[in-house]
Amino acid sequence: MEQTFIMIKPDGVQRGLVGEIIGRFEKKGFSLKGLKLITVDRAFAEKHYSDLSAKPFFNGLVDYIISGPVVAMVWEGKGVVTTGRKIIGATNPLESAPGTIRGDYAIDIGRNVIHGSDAVESARKEIALWFPEGVAEWQSSLHSWIYE
C-alpha cells in the first residue's frame, strides 16, 4: 500500500489546526502510520528542502520551518500521494479551492499550513529522513469497509 509524508508546518501547529488536518485524512479512509511533534534544526530543514536550495525563497522557507514545532506524519492508503495533494490544495493558497486545507485555512504562500509529498519517490525519501526508526505496522479494523 502506498505511503506519503505530510507535515503540518509551524503556522498550522500554532493555529491549532492539527486535529482538523488529521481528521480530514482519517475521514478519507487513510491510515496514520507515524506521527511526531518535533522542532527541527536548520541543517535538517535544509536537507528536507534541498531540492529548493537554488530558489530565492529557500532561506525564508527554512527560517519558517525552524520557527516552531511541526507535526510530521506518515499516511498510508490507495493513491494517498495524489489524493493527499488534492486534500491539501495548491501550493499558493489563493489558487486553492474551498474545501482543501489551504483553501480553507491559508492566505499567503509563505504560511501555507502544510506540506505533502509530491510523488511516491519523494514520499519514500521524506519518510526515510523524518522516520529513520520506521513507522507502525498495523491495519485498521475498518480496512475492509474502505477497500474492495
Curated annotation (Swiss-Prot):
The record's listing under PROSITE patterns reads: NDPK (PS00469), NDPK_LIKE (PS51374)
The protein's required cofactor(s) are namely:
Mg(2+)
Q: Pfam families this protein is in? A: NDK (PF00334)
The enzyme class is transferase
Q: Write the Enzyme Commission number(s) for this entry.
A: 2.7.4.6
Q: Which CDD domains match?
A: NDPk_I (cd04413)
Residues engaged in binding ATP: K9, F57, R85, T91, R102, N112
Q: Which GO terms describe its biological process?
A: CTP biosynthetic process; GTP biosynthetic process; UTP biosynthetic process
Transferase listed as a keyword:
yes
Q: Which GO terms describe its molecular function?
A: ATP binding; metal ion binding; nucleoside diphosphate kinase activity
Chemical reaction(s) catalysed: a 2'-deoxyribonucleoside 5'-diphosphate + ATP = a 2'-deoxyribonucleoside 5'-triphosphate + ADP; a ribonucleoside 5'-diphosphate + ATP = a ribonucleoside 5'-triphosphate + ADP
InterPro entries for this protein: NDK-like_dom, NDK-like_dom_sf, Nucleoside_diP_kinase, Nucleoside_diP_kinase_AS
Q: HAMAP family this protein is in?
A: NDP_kinase (MF_00451)
Give the protein's biological function: Major role in the synthesis of nucleoside triphosphates other than ATP. The ATP gamma phosphate is transferred to the NDP beta phosphate via a ping-pong mechanism, using a phosphorylated active-site intermediate.
Name listed for the protein in its UniProt record: Nucleoside diphosphate kinase 1
